[in-house]
């Protein structure tokens, strides 16, 4: 019989406002991380000296940027792990932090993520160096053999071509993807941390400047500056600090995986963007936690481009394969429907500072479970789900709930 893993909780969260790159003069990544970490520590009324280990996710930057950033908060000699897993860097750091606590090596781990990006499209995610292999060259080969390559941002082509494949195989329409972007921009109106807080009409989404094929600017996540942080603790720590039980969010399950052989073997753009990886992880997550999609009320999902949200509905088990567009038709992805998906505005509207994204999802879900989201609060929020991916590839799916709902209720 497999021994039960120790429980891990999030007790403090914080994030900066996500901003257009360079829009805040003099705002460098150490400043961003300091703001997010300080907010997270204030949230749980802890000190940096309480932190025993830390993970910091980022994509663009040199070695030891995590140290450089956290040194602005304190120098305590703790182990600091820098995590680079493409767009899943932040959630990969959460996965590592959870494992550290489960191992018994630490009771308090800080997980942060940040990005300071250049303006423009998500063009050079793999930071290519001319004299060596590109981390996504095999993924690009799949795309070149199916739809070819065009002079457009590579990531937009990847997800745009996945949408074209879905349209051809399953009958989704251009409007389904526009409706997802419209919905996420509408959600972000009530998120003060969001990069965009403006409502756009469906016509504005459809008629926006085209980035690739049918896909317009408002269906693509922007480049962003920002940071997010979460404080993870063990159950043993909570027993010694019961004041934190009322706000403790249990990480019920968190799965990290990489690409399956089908990514390169089947010449499918849907599989190339990580469908099988996420589907496998989600099945494992549901089985291990003994929860189902019907138990979930809110989901933060990696909508780097609108097509990925629709396709992921199928991968995580919200509906059968090929029926993601029916969720859009039924409005089962927003308030009043079966799930509220991306109440924060998602990557499309909240912003996508790559290393911060996965941690920011956990921040939003923790605040939703704690009932702290104001006008965007999801009613009767009991179980929350996270989905974060990085092409190259890495995928993370997770489930969260209040660890001690009785304690939370007694505090109200």
Curated annotation (Swiss-Prot):
Residue positions of motif Microbody targeting signal: 410-412
Reported consequences of knocking out the gene: In short-term culture, loss of the capacity to enter the dauer stage which is associated with a loss in the production of the dauer pheromone. In long-term culture, the capacity to induce the dauer stage is restored and is associated with the accumulation of long fatty acid chain ascarosides. Intestinal expression of daf-22 restores the production of the pheromone. Partial dauer phenotype in only half of mutants when the dauer pheromone is added exogenously.
Catalytic reaction(s) noted: choloyl-CoA + propanoyl-CoA = 3alpha,7alpha,12alpha-trihydroxy-24-oxo-5beta-cholestan-26-oyl-CoA + CoA
Cellular component terms (Gene Ontology): peroxisome
MF terms (GO), sorted A to Z: acyltransferase activity; lipid binding; propanoyl-CoA C-acyltransferase activity
Top-level division of the source organism's lineage: Eukaryota
Tissues where this protein is expressed: Expressed in intestine, hypodermis and body-wall muscle.
UniProt keyword terms in alphabetical order: Lipid transport, Lipid-binding, Peroxisome, Transferase, Transport
Localization annotation: Peroxisome
Entry EC no(s): 2.3.1.176
SUPFAM superfamilies in the record: Thiolase-like
The keyword Transmembrane is assigned to this record: no
Activity regulation summary: Inhibited by acetyl-CoA.
GO BP terms in the entry: acyl-CoA metabolic process; ascaroside biosynthetic process; dauer entry; dauer exit; lipid transport; negative regulation of lipid storage; olfactory learning; pheromone biosynthetic process
Family: Belongs to the thiolase-like superfamily. Thiolase family.
Purpose: Catalyzes the thiolytic cleavage of 3-ketoacyl-CoA with 8-16 carbon residues in the acyl group using a ping-pong mechanism whereby binding to 3-ketooctanoyl-CoA results in the release of acetyl-CoA and the subsequent addition of CoA produces 3-ketohexanohyl-CoA. Involved in the biosynthesis of the dauer pheromone by providing short chains of fatty acid that are attached to the ascarylose sugars of the pheromone.
PANTHER family, per the entry: ACETYL-COA C-ACETYLTRANSFERASE, NON-SPECIFIC LIPID-TRANSFER PROTEIN-LIKE 2
NCBIfam families linked to this entry: PRK08256.1
Protein name in the entry: Non-specific lipid-transfer protein-like 2
Organism: Caenorhabditis elegans
Name of the gene encoding the protein in the UniProt record: daf-22
